[in-house]
């Protein structure tokens, strides 16, 4: 994943493990609670980290999550390339917010968290351009909530990014490294 590569590329040593919480259930409960959608990534990052800390109580555990908000609606990952095309048509020529959060837990509590918001505008895309893009990316694009990967072929369809580039990749890296340097 891009988060894994990001953290490895800055020289961090760590192990990864899947969160033990049901992410979809956590998300559903959060949405039903009618809390501000923009706080969902911070909530999910914390829940993921806390679910892992149970098995690794003496380690620092880092959880992270990213969401996209477009026209005040949460955007979910596409399940197939047909859905990816619809999503790119919807986002074409328009701006959306990418919100990424990181939570650091130790023992049974969160000791630090951060959340960043970046704004991305996609180029105006026609069907042919979208089809060509999806043909190049293949199904791997389905792992990206916006159906583009800024660190790979995404610049072909991204018009502009306002805010932290690493946040667009799914991790508020500068804030995290600042936390680590103070710890």
Where are these regions (language model features)?
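Short beta-strand scaffold segments in enzyme catalytic cores
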Residues: 66-68, 98-105, 148
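Acidic/polar active-site rim loop that often engages polyanionic ligands
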Residues: 25-27, 67-69, 109-116, 161
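Generic enzyme active-site microenvironment
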Residues: 63
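Short beta-strand-to-turn element immediately C-terminal to the catalytic PLP-Schiff-base lysine
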Residues: 69, 103-106, 123, 159-160
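Active-site-adjacent loop/tail segments of enzyme domains
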Residues: 66-96, 122-124
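Anionic-ligand binding region
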Residues: 85-91, 100-118
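N-terminal polybasic phosphate/anion-binding patch
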Residues: 1-60, 73-74, 128, 132, ...
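GST superfamily/GST-like fold recognition
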Residues: 1-12, 84, 94, 117-183
